[in-house]
């Protein structure tokens, strides 16, 4: 990695690209060019490409992405929490007085829950695709510990029905975006 890099940059394994988030969208920096390229325009609070999903910051932030070992692709699993209601908890350990903390949390039986979409980005062409991961209504999606460092062609995820009675292990071909149930 280049020396003295800002903490909010995520570098590709070969250090030829770096990614950062600004106002919930992704920006690409090429090592040969100092002009950032905006990769996304649909990021917003509670539906962000940034790790700072709940804040409206005017500062550059760390992106919620993972690079493949070959530096040819990276992915972002986005969680849409815009319609989910707020939940509150009292932080009794806060100093000097307890504080009320707010976060998004879907309660059992509520209509709206978190939804997910998986994006694959190709920095060489500045293109990206949205992978079709939908199968169950209101499904939960998690990335499984994939070895993108040594096997950059395969990304694994699980999808689970809201009732938790069905679950699939799936493989994504990162070159095409095709999904295969394992």
What are these regions (language model features)?
Residues 1-46, 53, 136-138, 153, ...:
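A conserved hydrophobic secondary-structure block that centers on an alpha-helix together
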Residues 4, 11-14, 58-63, 102-105, ...:
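Short alpha-helical segments and helix-capping/turn motifs at coil-helix boundaries
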Residues 5-8, 62, 96, 141-143:
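Conserved positions at the start
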Residues 15-25, 30, 63-66, 75-81, ...:
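Beta-strand C-termini and the immediately following turn/loop, strongest in propeller blades
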Residues 26, 36, 74, 118-120, ...:
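Hydrophobic beta-strand positions in blades of beta-propellers and related beta-sheet-rich domains
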Residues 31-34, 122-126, 174-177:
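Short loop/turn segments that connect beta-strands within beta-propeller blades
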Residues 39-64, 76-130:
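Predominantly five- to eight-bladed beta-propeller fold
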Residues 127-131, 135-161, 175-176:
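Long hydrophobic segments that form regular secondary structure
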């Amino acid at each position: 990695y280049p020396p003295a890099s800002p903490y909010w940059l995520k570098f590709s394994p070969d250090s030829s690209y770096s990614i950062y988030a600004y106002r919930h969208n992704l920006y690409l920096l090429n090592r040969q060019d100092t002009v950032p390229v905006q990769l996304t325009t649909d990021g917003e609070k509670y539906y962000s490409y940034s790790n700072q999903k709940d804040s409206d910051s005017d500062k550059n932030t760390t992106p919620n992405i993972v690079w493949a070992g070959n530096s040819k692709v990276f992915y972002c699993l986005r969680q849409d929490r815009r319609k989910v209601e707020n939940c509150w908890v009292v932080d009794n350990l806060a100093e000097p007085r307890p504080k009320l903390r707010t976060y998004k949390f879907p309660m059992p039986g509520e209509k709206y829950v978190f939804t997910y979409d998986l994006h694959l980005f190709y920095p060489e062409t500045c293109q990206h695709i949205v992978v079709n991961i939908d199968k169950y209504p209101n499904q939960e999606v998690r990335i499984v510990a994939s070895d993108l460092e040594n096997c950059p062609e395969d990304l694994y995820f699980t999808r689970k029905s809201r009732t938790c009675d069905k679950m699939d292990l799936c493989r994504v071909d990162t070159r095409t975006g095709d999904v295969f149930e394992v």
